[in-house]
Amino acid sequence: MGKTFNLTRREDGIAILTMDVPGETMNTLKAEFGPEISEILSEIKRDSSIRGLVLISGKKDSFVAGADISMLDACQTAGDAKALSQQGHVVFNELEALNIPVVAAIHGACLGGGLELALACHQRVCSDDGKTMLGVPEVQLGLLPGGGGTQRLPRLVGITTALDMMLTGKQIRPKQALKMGLVNDVVPQTILLQTAVEMALAGKQIAKPVKKSLVNQLLEGTGFGRNIIFDQAAKQVAKKTQGNYPAPAKIIDCVRQGIAKGMQKGLEVEASHFAELVVSKESEALRSIFFATTEMKKETGAEGATPRKVKKAVILGGGLMGGGIASVTTTKAKIPARVKDINEKGLSNALSYAYKLLDKGVKRRHMTPAARDNLMALMTTTTEYKGVKDADIVVEAVFEDLALKHQMVKDIERECGEHTIFASNTSSLPIGQIAQAASRPENVIGLHYFSPVEKMPLVEVIAHAKTSPETIATTVAFARKQGKTPIVVQDGAGFYVNRILALYMNEAAQLLLEGQSVEHLDKALVKFGFPVGPITLLDEVGIDVGAKISPILEKELGERFKAPAAFDKLLSDDRKGRKNGKGFYQYGAASKKKAVDETVYGVLGIKPGVDKEMSAVAERCVVQMLNEAVRCLDAGIIASPRDGDIGAIFGIGFPPFLGGPFHYIDTLGADNLVKILERYQTQYGDRFEPCQRLKAMAAEKARFF
């Protein structure tokens, strides 16, 4: 590898230090850079003609995107990780201690170690470009800022703001960064370097105090007040993480100790906590997700196939799903979308859906009204098949009715070109059955989004036996442009995500009928690590939707998918969930606090009894999901354990700190999982029978990774 840092001297005495990692599109910090930076800093100290220093990136749209995560996996022990953090401290302290002004000129991603580098500079100026974002997202990998970030950030922007940034991993836009005091100036990219040079020539400036509310001044200005901030943050973290993620509590401790005992002590605590987190099983799991998604971005979904460019999309159906799909097509992918619905109400719903989402951006000052209107102009509507002939892809989002979908296929083949892809958003019907109506079955594919479309990151791309590789590759590329994480799955009832979810939900329903309360069931699975409990999820998705999917899965996959009788009783009482304000929970203006509708127990003919241990409740639901995930792998529904992990995490919120179903099975041990399943099989019947692959793995002590 060639040199990453290049020092040039200007006639006015300002030196420019340009960072440009050879052979990479983005700058990342690597352990081997330490000696190179130290040598340059020594050179600067020796040269009395240098009056100031500007740090800038040689990359097009990246300042420094963070530390190279792969170097953490090279750490064999906590001691190795601690040494990495301490090396960063030495270099950044040396930079900060220079007796000349040091200015960071920031354009593009300035994240993690990149922001910590900028914080070690005396001043920061950033471009006003939309690509410029600043943040410390380490917590999302189960880590904390290990290059002095837990110490410098609170001292610059205040404790409350710094904790918010570090505990959420949120990324800050330029104007917001200026307002909070994170940067000293925001300028157009064209004059970024010039401005940074002028700042360096002006000399070290005394930092302007960040404007704080009176409450914040009182809290952050006294030891008693700071204790209130830290205690409140700790309570919120405990509630949010359920004790499953160690990083947030350690971030709070770093800041607390640094403020109370000084910078040096704070850095020592930071290095120690960073090291503990690097070797924690939670961070290892979260980093595995990061590497998996990074790897997947390089794949087309079909080996050797080249995706066609999608210049125009048509969405059939303007309902909740159709409106969401049209919205991400225009706003994220910037691809024109024509929405077709049989009535004007559906079309106005789709337009309103997209407008509301974009207008939120305007209200938050993330975009201008003109930018919103330009994106809205990409969406057009029709009640007939007009203006659809040149569509490259048609996404069907109509009712789950096979005859209706057959009609859609025939209509599109008649109205559109021979190359047009027909992508069905069905959640349960096998794609092969939909393709039976097609004269060009190679163009038919499944594209299963999750609700709400703009928030849920996963899509399942479902290939049936005759889907062409080019159709798969084009659909995968289209989904990525929409900002989605696609996994390619093979055809079959429920595909992957709904198939593993169905057994999990069925088991929760069984526990409910056995006398477990609604609240206890939901709390048990939230404590396990799911974002919401299974009963809340059923209310959100729709009890009627669950009732429609279950018979399809039972018919195709067998008795173990038979849903408990609860569905029929609930639907007879017109309980569909949130959508009609009547489900397991109370809805409406009167029920601000989430409360169970106690009348649901009477409808089900049950009376809540003694609650089981939360861990036992969660285990019964989760082992069903794990067993079925392995069946899906064995049947070729998913291509790899990696895809199964990503599908479960991004599709249904499987706890990320466990790494996904397959990583979790490795943690448990296949032999232990088989024992648990066999114990439940004895107690509750054959729906718990371990699949053959799990039994074989248990016998061989085999692992997935």
Swiss-Prot record:
Q: Which superkingdom does the taxonomy of this entry point to?
A: Bacteria
Question: What InterPro entries does this protein map onto?
Answer: 3-OHacyl-CoA_DH_NAD-bd (IPR006176), 3HC_DH_C (IPR006108), 6-PGluconate_DH-like_C_sf (IPR008927), ClpP/crotonase-like_dom_sf (IPR029045), Enoyl-CoA_hydra/iso (IPR001753), FA_oxidation_alpha_subunit (IPR050136), FadJ (IPR012802), NAD(P)-bd_dom_sf (IPR036291)
Q: Where is this region: 3-hydroxyacyl-CoA dehydrogenase?
A: 308-705
GO MF terms here are: 3-hydroxybutyryl-CoA epimerase activity; enoyl-CoA hydratase activity; long-chain-3-hydroxyacyl-CoA dehydrogenase activity; NAD+ binding
Q: Which Enzyme Commission numbers does its entry carry?
A: 4.2.1.17, 5.1.2.3, 1.1.1.35
Q: Which controlled-vocabulary keywords does the entry list?
A: Cytoplasm, Fatty acid metabolism, Isomerase, Lipid degradation, Lipid metabolism, Lyase, Multifunctional enzyme, NAD, Oxidoreductase
Which cysteine pairs are joined by S-S bonds?
A: none
Reaction catalysed by this enzyme: a (3S)-3-hydroxyacyl-CoA = a (2E)-enoyl-CoA + H2O; a 4-saturated-(3S)-3-hydroxyacyl-CoA = a (3E)-enoyl-CoA + H2O; a (3S)-3-hydroxyacyl-CoA + NAD(+) = a 3-oxoacyl-CoA + NADH + H(+); (3S)-3-hydroxybutanoyl-CoA = (3R)-3-hydroxybutanoyl-CoA
Any one Gene Ontology cellular component term annotated for this protein? cytoplasm
Pathway where this protein functions? Lipid metabolism; fatty acid beta-oxidation
The record's subcellular locations are: Cytoplasm
Pfam families given for it? 3HCDH, 3HCDH_N, ECH_1
Its predominant location is cytoplasm
Report the record's Gene Ontology biological process terms: fatty acid beta-oxidation
Location of region: Enoyl-CoA hydratase: 1-188
| Residues annotated as site: Important for catalytic activity | E116, E138
Relate the assembly described in the record: Heterotetramer of two alpha chains (FadJ) and two beta chains (FadI).
Q: What does this protein do?
A: Catalyzes the formation of a hydroxyacyl-CoA by addition of water on enoyl-CoA. Also exhibits 3-hydroxyacyl-CoA epimerase and 3-hydroxyacyl-CoA dehydrogenase activities.
Annotated HAMAP family: FadJ
Q: Which family does it belong to?
A: In the N-terminal section; belongs to the enoyl-CoA hydratase/isomerase family.
The protein's name: Fatty acid oxidation complex subunit alpha
Lineage of producing organism: Bacteria, Pseudomonadati, Pseudomonadota, Gammaproteobacteria, Alteromonadales
